[in-house]
């Protein structure tokens, strides 16, 4: 993520937002619902590796999520109040990232899925879906992964054996096969 200055003002006409194409409303909702996962992952990162975490910001996002969740059925009826809650939630997510200096309050594994799909589509010259739609799908995949992880008992020896047997050349070949010309920049940051 790159730091950008916050805007001086935002103007959003909720009547216009409520009349937006339904796919755009769904994308906004998809991006907002992802915050359930991102806030949990942020807390886990704090507990496991000591990453910066702010409970006040996390609670700000949880409250925005509650309002979006409660208003979500109104999006189908194009209620301006529902569109307002989604817009406010997305704005608060941006503010939360600006306050913390990291994207964690608003972005987790689900966003990685979206970014990978975007890179792969760009590499192949294919169209991409709306960011919030992709993030919504990434949220469903993330939840499935989290559910699978609940059934795993950590095994230190197995992890150490995996590290010993890690084949960096095979991993690099896989990255190059999947990401083609984007692989060099990915490998440089790995």
Regions of interest found by a model, annotated:
Residues 58-190:
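Active-site segments that bind and position negatively charged phosphate/pyrophosphate groups
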Residues 1-66:
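A glycine/threonine-rich phosphate-anchoring loop and its flanking beta-alpha core
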